[in-house]
């Protein structure tokens, strides 16, 4: 799980 913006977490990227 790479570090992403809180808004991107919904994508589970």
Curated annotation (Swiss-Prot):
It comes from the Eukaryota. GO terms for biological process: defense response. Expressed by the skin dorsal glands. This is Uperin-5.1. One of its GO terms (cellular component) is extracellular region. Its main location: secreted. It is found in: Secreted. Keywords: Amphibian defense peptide, Secreted.
